Amino acid sequence: MPQAQIRKTQRNPKLWIAALVAASIVTISYKVYSSYIAEENIEDKKTEGDGGVEEKLRIAKRYTKKSIALTLSHSVLSSQLPLNEILLNSENVTFILPPNLSMDDLVCNIGNADEVERYNLPKTLLNNYKLLHCSNIDGYFNILKNLKPDTLLVCSEDLGIANNVPRDLHRFVKEIINIDQNKDDIYKKLSSIFIK
């Protein structure tokens, strides 16, 4: 390249402006990208560091794509499970309140929240059709037949249905997991599904 042509390119303001704009775009893109990655790392560290219930309350891989019906019997409500978090953080789970329990029983057993949250939780679940209440045992079985869950978690001793299960229920519910009234059995079976 001749000297005259080099001098013209050095004096050309359009070329300098284009180079400045390109450098600015690259710098801004890098800063945005690095801040985005930093935010993700901070969020990951928070969830790892918390070790809290939100991180632990995920449905086990075996049950992620299955619909689950959990009967909130007296034994389940009195267990040591974090029911408040399970009720709010479970997406494909429907909770059934059997005929022998009322909303007040549910409210009394989902503790560790202030009064306002405790009384709003069942209403929120009812409004989202995650909590169904039946008035008798026949209604309970009709709910199950209409829901057709893949898995049913029930303490049949609490409901008094150990010997009264309809024969055709297995046509509507693929897997029935019967839970004993023992708190350890309840915690073991339910935590294997709801707590990672």
From Swiss-Prot:
Protein name: Peroxisome assembly protein 22
Cited function: Involved in peroxisome biogenesis.
Listed InterPro entries: Peroxin-22, Peroxin-22_C_sf
CC annotations in GO: peroxisomal membrane
UniProt KW Membrane keyword: yes
Subcellular location: Peroxisome membrane
Gene3D superfamilies cross-referenced by the UniProt entry: Peroxisome assembly protein 22
Family: Belongs to the peroxin-22 family.
Membrane-topology descriptor: Single-pass membrane protein
A biological-process GO annotation: peroxisome organization
Transmembrane segments: 15-37
Matching Pfam families: Peroxin-22
Keywords, sorted A to Z: Membrane, Peroxisome, Peroxisome biogenesis, Transmembrane, Transmembrane helix
Organism lineage string: Eukaryota, Fungi, Dikarya, Ascomycota, Saccharomycotina
Annotated organism of origin: Debaryomyces hansenii (strain ATCC 36239 / CBS 767 / BCRC 21394 / JCM 1990 / NBRC 0083 / IGC 2968)
